[in-house]
């Protein structure tokens, strides 16, 4: 179910404060965050945010196309290694 329009998009306060400081200082630093639920705002464009995937921080460079999406969409939590080959062939 989608979020109500009257509420507006969600961003964690600590992440928004960090990004506002970066924009004001005009620096290009990597910002570490655990907030996968935060929505990407237009102010984030051009910055790199390291999003936690449960094991490590994955650097995500924010582009125009990402605005409105959640940070967690760009840091997958599960790694698919493919199905294992059948062992019957190797035993012979």
Swiss-Prot record:
Superkingdom of origin: Bacteria
PROSITE patterns with a match to the protein in the record: RIBOSOMAL_S19 (PS00323)
Keyword Transmembrane part of the UniProt annotation: no
Entries under SUPFAM superfamilies matching the protein: Ribosomal protein S19
Record key words, sorted: Ribonucleoprotein, Ribosomal protein, RNA-binding, rRNA-binding
GO cellular component: cytoplasm; small ribosomal subunit
InterPro entries with a match to the protein in the record: Ribosomal_uS19 (IPR002222), Ribosomal_uS19_bac-type (IPR005732), Ribosomal_uS19_CS (IPR020934), Ribosomal_uS19_SF (IPR023575)
One Gene Ontology MF term: rRNA binding
Gene3D superfamilies, per the entry: 30s Ribosomal Protein S19, Chain A (3.30.860.10)
GO biological process: ribosomal small subunit assembly; translation
Record Pfam families: Ribosomal_S19 (PF00203)
Family: Belongs to the universal ribosomal protein uS19 family.
Function: Protein S19 forms a complex with S13 that binds strongly to the 16S ribosomal RNA.
Full protein name: Small ribosomal subunit protein uS19
Species the sequence originates in: Bacillus mycoides (strain KBAB4)
Record lineage: Bacteria, Bacillati, Bacillota, Bacilli, Bacillales
Gene: rpsS
């Amino acid at each position: 179910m989608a979020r109500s329009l009257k509420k507006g998009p969600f961003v964690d306060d600590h992440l928004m404060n960090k990004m506002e400081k970066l924009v004001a200082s005009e620096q290009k630093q990597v910002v570490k965050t655990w907030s996968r639920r935060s929505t990407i705002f237009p102010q984030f464009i051009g910055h790199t945010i390291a999003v936690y995937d449960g094991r490590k921080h994955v650097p995500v460079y924010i582009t125009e196309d990402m605005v409105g999406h959640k940070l967690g969409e760009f840091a997958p939590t599960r790694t698919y290694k493919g199905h294992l080959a059948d062992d019957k062939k190797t035993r012979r």
